[in-house]
Design a protein with these regions (language model features):
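Pyridoxal 5′-phosphate
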Residues: 1-421
Length: 421
């Protein structure tokens, strides 16, 4: 394969891409040469939809013109604004609308879920986590374990890849669940791992955990909006995710949370951290002293939500609804496959792609452990308008996302690499 072949293929793929028009609905940053950057970093911070500014401005104007009356008299009243998101989020994570809610931020939601779902006993207090769990999740978990009087070093079991492999196979996680079933209270895994890009089988892990009465919860920061999900049917107990990566809600955007209906609608509501926005909507403003949770995920809300952050998120969710997850996933597999083909074909000695090769076991990110001049290659990419990221000690992450990336972006990435070598 040559670079010229790759360019020809990319031109054709871009010409035949039925989602190509969606790129115009995003603001693509410009490189110093005036051309669009090749933005391969949607796994870190998604780009701004062109409609986001207007959507936020509408709320600013409402605030200016209505003041407090915006809560009830605005055409999209703020008191119920977050409800606009349930249908979209339910589609994206495969849930019923009442099983999802947009609230807080990811780590806060993880704490809220651990408070309700990590119920250690003397015998069963351990938590199984994946090998490259995001540090914030480990900090949250360790602090929750300590708060319940256990020792995190003893209580956290880490599922590691078997010697020859860099990725964690679902069957190995299931084997660990079987092995430690009598001491596990919770399994907490990433849907897609932030470092390796590996995707785990949520249904299989949940099923194995439930066979032994263990709760199964998931961090979907890198899965939501990236891979198809069916949390309700897979029976997950809870999940949390952020909206600033694949869901393009902007930096620090309000996050998402899923609670399966069997918990959200249980006759005996789960213990939780409570706040007035989770209180029954009909009596919330009676300001009574006793907390009565809204059935479903909304019952875990604490505060009235950050309106401008929600407003910035809405246009992206509408784009997801317009494109449909099936079409996005098909393009995502094609883009990632093309990137892998280009890297393996043109730079076989550059490094090792540590993300699994099977499309079903990954999303749109490829993590490459670069064996030669890793930092130099990364610096060259960014200096030449290929925006990607670096994870210590030697991993470059490239993520072509189907909403706004073109096959031509991958060619640009490869062109820079071929000059940097
Ligand atoms: C997998 C994963 N979990 C948790 C977090 C923490 O998110 P937040 O800072 O929004 O709480 C991140 C942030 O990038 C992440 O990638």
């Amino acid at each position: 394969m040559t670079l010229a072949d790759l360019r020809t293929q990319a031109d054709e793929l871009d010409r035949n891409d039925s989602l190509a028009h969606l790129r115009d609905r995003f603001c693509i940053p410009r490189h110093t040469d005036g051309a669009d950057v090749a933005y391969l970093c949607g796994n870190s911070l998604g780009l701004a939809p062109t409609a986001a500014r207007e959507c936020v401005e509408q709320e600013l104007v409402a605030w200016e013109q209505l003041g407090v009356e915006g809560h009830f008299k605005h055409e999209r009243p703020w008191v119920s604004f977050h409800e606009l998101f349930a249908k979209h989020l339910a589609e994206i994570v495969g849930a019923k609308p009442y099983e999802v809610v947009a609230m807080n931020t990811l780590t806060v939601n993880l704490h809220l879920m651990l408070t309700s779902f990590y119920r250690p006993t003397h015998e069963r207090f351990k938590v199984l986590v994946g090998h490259a769990a995001f540090p914030s999740d480990r900090y949250a978990l360790a602090s929750q374990i300590e708060l319940r009087g256990h020792n995190p070093e003893e209580a956290i079991l880490t599922a590691k890849p078997l010697a020859a492999s860099r990725v964690l196979r679902t069957e190995d996680v299931v084997a660990l669940i079987e092995q430690h079933a009598s001491e596990l209270a919770l399994v907490l895994m990433d849907g897609v791992n932030y470092y390796t890009g590996e995707r785990i089988d949520i249904a299989a892990i949940t099923e194995a955990a439930h066979r032994h009465g263990i709760v199964a919860g998931f961090d979907l920061a890198h899965a939501a909006g990236n891979v198809p999900l069916a949390l309700h049917d897979w029976n997950a107990d809870f999940a949390v995710w952020c909206h600033y990566k694949y869901l393009n809600g902007g930096p620090g955007c309000v996050a998402g949370c899923f609670v399966h209906e069997r918990h959200g609608f249980a006759r005996e509501p789960r213990a939780r951290m409570a706040g007035w926005w989770g209180h029954d909507k009909h009596s919330r403003f009676k300001m009574g002293p006793d907390f009565e949770p809204i059935p479903g995920a909304e019952g875990w809300q604490l505060s009235n939500p950050p309106l401008f952050s929600l407003a910035a998120l809405l246009p992206s969710l509408e784009l997801f609804a317009e494109a449909g997850m099936d079409r996005l996933r098909a393009k995502s597999e094609a883009l990632t496959g093309f990137l892998e083909l280009a890297i393996r074909g043109l730079f076989p000695e550059w490094g090792e792609v540590i993300t699994p090769a099977e499309p079903a076991r990954r999303g749109c990110q490829l993590s490459i452990r670069v064996t030669r001049d890793a930092k130099r290659a990364f610096v060259a990419l960014v200096a030449n308008g290929v925006i990607c990221d670096w994870r210590e000690p030697d991993v470059i992450r490239l993520a072509p996302v189907p909403l706004y990336n073109r096959f031509a972006d991958i060619v640009r990435c490869v062109e820079v690499l071929s000059c940097a070598k």
